[in-house]
Amino acid sequence: MKSHIQSLLEQTIESFKQQGILPADFEARIQVDRTKDKSHGDLATNLAMMLTKAAGKNPRELAQLIIDNLPASAYVAKVEIAGPGFINFFIDDSALANQLQAAISDEHLGIKLPTPQTIVVDYSSPNLAKEMHVGHLRSTIIGDSVVRTLEFLGHKVIRQNHVGDWGTQFGMLLAYMEELRAQNGEQAQLELSDLETFYRAAKLRFDESAEFATRARQLVVELQSGDEYCNKLWREFNDISLSHCHEVYERLGVSLTRADVHGESAYNADLEQVVKDLDAQGLLTQSNGAKVVFQEEFRNKEGEALPVIIQKADGGYLYATTDLAAMRYRSSVLKADRVLYFVDLRQALHFQQVFSLAKLAKFVRNDMSLEHLGFGTMNGEDGRPFKTRTGGVVKLVDLLDEANTRALELVRSKNPDMDEATLAEIARVVGISAVKYADLSKNRTSDYIFSFEQMLSFEGNTAPYLLYAYTRVAGIFKRATDIDLSQAKIVLEHEKEKDLGNKLAQFGEILSRVIDKGQPHVLCGYLYELAGAFSSFYEACPVLAADNDEQKHSRLLLSQLTANTLQKGLNLLGIETLERM
């Protein structure tokens, strides 16, 4: 509906250009917003005030002129001018009902799909050396939610799990694995549960033994030169690490697969060429033996230009080099229209610099959008980064285990007679959903406090509340199995029916915001409001006990569309729904 009003206003502006009211080359960004006070209509725009200077007319006079020139629309019941020149639109109830009716049988719930694009999404991307920890959660689940929404809206999405599978630390790991093999024979296997212990032991050996450190550095050189033995050990280690990652992804309900892994090592062969191409364009400068690029727009507090280090004095490459190679690949090979990076906000300057450099060096097409969608930190209840009681990093699997245990206790307390298998399955869904939703419901750019007590509450904007809200709506149809709705029509008469209908009609607008800004919390807020709108409707408007069949069938259709929207919205967040709780 919002996009429809915007389209009417766009046509009006074109008419003004033809009439000479506005200059022929005039361009305006039309903003249409939902009103908070329904006495002011359903939608409003300040377009008249925006056009005042260009048209040379006062806002109220211009507002009336806009209304007089609006194309006729069955969706608009009336239009009014308010205040200094706001234009308020009242949506026709029957037109809204028809829109909702069509949405019920549509796989996209009546949403008009945008022009499809090819969109690369870089997310999760853990370093392969240690087990995934809580610091990997946000990128993984925020990125996955946006990916799901992009695909639902018809875009071609290419997932890129840019894992850290290369670098000098692998010499240390390979050297330690080599020692273990020497002690235990070729049959020695590194178990997934040993990843943290293995890494810490290797680091300890590296710090304490000069001989070990020398061997580690030697192995880096051999690995980079393609030594078969080193590459074999390296592949084994990465395979173990990736197996662990994908076990976590499966538990989280994340859609990443092995086929989506395109890590740092994938660009090894391109790094030398990146350096040569930057040098050929005269962009490289020598600084303390390193090859760097200075860009005038990036300076420190003292006003000195900040370097992007491309190659270290010892010949080694850095993240910037790999990122530039990845950007070129995503532009020239993957043909991306947009590339979205879900990476910690603390990397903001890095991405600003490499995005600018990639454009400057023509590594990417000018029309390709590079977007760093950064996120804040998950903190403990003390307001500091989430840690174990001993100050260590919290493993993601341990966090999920704890969530499952607490969810099981919660579900059992509410269903003491339920069988263990059903309890376990419900607890699995509730526990994982609670962790994911607690994160996704927060503004991506904000830090937030992690609290099991809050996230497992059945009150407020939480996963348990929404999962229960869905089962409540779906439960209506368990009591209405013999009712034929094939000829039923939605009729909006009661104020609460209209409120619910208006909220349902906003789903497409919400999903557009999710994919435009990478903000799943907007969808979470919408689903919470939708559940509240349904609750108000259900209390005020008897469904199965309606006054007549026409009213009952209409309200059942509204309930069905609510269930469909809640389920689809939760699925786009990567959250399973339950039929009972």
UniProtKB/Swiss-Prot annotation:
<dbReference type="Pfam" id="PF00750">
    <property type="entry name" value="tRNA-synt_1d"/>
</dbReference>
<keyword id="KW-0547">Nucleotide-binding</keyword>
<comment type="similarity">
    <text>Belongs to the class-I aminoacyl-tRNA synthetase family.</text>
</comment>
<protein>
    <recommendedName>
        <fullName>Arginine--tRNA ligase</fullName>
        <ecNumber>6.1.1.19</ecNumber>
    </recommendedName>
</protein>
<dbReference type="Pfam" id="PF05746">
    <property type="entry name" value="DALR_1"/>
</dbReference>
<dbReference type="GO" id="GO:0004814">
    <property type="term" value="F:arginine-tRNA ligase activity"/>
</dbReference>
<feature type="short sequence motif" description="'HIGH' region">
    <location>
        <begin position="126"/>
        <end position="136"/>
    </location>
</feature>
<dbReference type="GO" id="GO:0006420">
    <property type="term" value="P:arginyl-tRNA aminoacylation"/>
</dbReference>
<keyword id="KW-0030">Aminoacyl-tRNA synthetase</keyword>
<keyword id="KW-0067">ATP-binding</keyword>
<dbReference type="InterPro" id="IPR005148">
    <property type="entry name" value="Arg-tRNA-synth_N"/>
</dbReference>
<dbReference type="InterPro" id="IPR009080">
    <property type="entry name" value="tRNAsynth_Ia_anticodon-bd"/>
</dbReference>
<dbReference type="InterPro" id="IPR035684">
    <property type="entry name" value="ArgRS_core"/>
</dbReference>
<keyword id="KW-0963">Cytoplasm</keyword>
<dbReference type="InterPro" id="IPR014729">
    <property type="entry name" value="Rossmann-like_a/b/a_fold"/>
</dbReference>
<dbReference type="InterPro" id="IPR008909">
    <property type="entry name" value="DALR_anticod-bd"/>
</dbReference>
<keyword id="KW-0648">Protein biosynthesis</keyword>
<dbReference type="InterPro" id="IPR001278">
    <property type="entry name" value="Arg-tRNA-ligase"/>
</dbReference>
<dbReference type="GO" id="GO:0005737">
    <property type="term" value="C:cytoplasm"/>
</dbReference>
<dbReference type="Pfam" id="PF03485">
    <property type="entry name" value="Arg_tRNA_synt_N"/>
</dbReference>
<keyword id="KW-0436">Ligase</keyword>
<dbReference type="InterPro" id="IPR036695">
    <property type="entry name" value="Arg-tRNA-synth_N_sf"/>
</dbReference>
<dbReference type="InterPro" id="IPR001412">
    <property type="entry name" value="aa-tRNA-synth_I_CS"/>
</dbReference>
<comment type="subunit">
    <text>Monomer.</text>
</comment>
<dbReference type="GO" id="GO:0005524">
    <property type="term" value="F:ATP binding"/>
</dbReference>
